[in-house]
Amino acid sequence: SRFRPGWLARSSMVAATLTGADSYWVGDHLNGLVPRSIATPEYLGIAAKLVPSVDANYEPWTMLGNLAYGRPKRLRLGICVTDAGRRNPAVTAQAAATLQLLTRGNAILGIGVGEREGNEPYGVEWTRPVARFEEALATIRALWNSNGELVSRESAYFPLQNAAFELPPYRGKWPEIWVAAHGPRMLRATGRYADAWVPIVLVRPGDYSTALEAVRTAASDAGRDPMSIIPSAVRGVITGRDRDDVEEALDSVVVKMTALGVPGTAWARHGVEHPMGADFAGVQDVIPQTMDEQTVLSYTAKVPPALMKEVVFSGTPEEVVDQVAQWRDHGLEYLLVINGSLVNPSLRKAVAASLPHAKVLRGLKKL
């Protein structure tokens, strides 16, 4: 970046705080989710100027440790989400526990299976990501609950033999574990282990409530209070001064890239086959750094407009708040907001969307 390391993240954190956010999150990726072939001002607008290289990502735990100092004391810091396989769970347990101490009890460990793009190109085994995830969660819990005693645990992926873990919780409290889960097996694991559920690619409120019920059933089966698990979600927000600005942003190549991350079944509902195959599983199998410009343009040209309106919350601030309220009525309690308006190719319209976006955030606080 042309700015000093951490400037953009800290500025974003301050802006989020000023608009009433009570948590700030960073992702965990070795490379970007936007193909480098379209990471240009033509497609990314002002975002390309702020971040000239989409594949130059800071290590998130180091970044969060830096942000922990000077942040408002009430602000929680989270990672959304770290990989269960690319990082050894003992190291993840250590990193999250460290951040919990640095933030005085305000750290959140978001975790999921990760994506193919951040694992397979780097030599990380990707044939059984869910099994690795389950073992990683069990390992983290085993270390945190060890009370300093040596831990030995059999595992096909992360065996422990006389493993020591003596970092203490902050005032008896470990970081909350928020799990990004979508499929049946992941939803069951969420119910067994998680403090919160934070899906990323569910596109309809009815699908959300159905999956939430599966999480709560799994929690009950595991002897846990099903209502103790926080129903959350990560969603992009596209807003602007008027409907025309919003529609222009929704039709941009970068925003439509998000639709490539939803499964082929979601496309089929709109009568269109996913360009990567009818049975394409979704964001976990996208490898953006290998996609050339023409491929991206041909794929995004096929995105049904109606699907885009399912993938993100979009519209005027009032319309966005109404859409979130519908999800709230289906069980959503905590929303992680991605400001998608910033990637409008028009610099003027991206900047103009900042006030409507702030209005959205203020409206969400009132729900």
Curated annotation (Swiss-Prot):
Highest taxon in the source lineage: Bacteria
UniProt-listed GO biological process terms: lipid metabolic process
Enzyme Commission no: 1.2.-.-
Keyword Cell division belongs to the record: no
Signal sequence bounds: none
Single Gene Ontology MF annotation: oxidoreductase activity, acting on paired donors, with incorporation or reduction of molecular oxygen
EC top class named in words: oxidoreductase
SUPFAM superfamilies: Bacterial luciferase-like
Keywords noted in UniProt: Lipid biosynthesis, Lipid metabolism, Oxidoreductase
Pfam families for this protein: Bac_luciferase
Record has Lipid biosynthesis as a keyword: yes
Function: Catalyzes the reduction of the keto moiety of phthiodiolone dimycocerosates (DIM B) and glycosylated phenolphthiodiolone dimycocerosates to form the intermediate compounds phthiotriol and glycosylated phenolphthiotriol dimycocerosates during phthiocerol dimycocerosates (DIM A) and glycosylated phenolphthiocerol dimycocerosates (PGL) biosynthesis.
Family named by the database record: Belongs to the mer family. Phthiodiolone/phenolphthiodiolone dimycocerosates ketoreductase subfamily.
Name under which the protein is recorded: Phthiodiolone/phenolphthiodiolone dimycocerosates ketoreductase
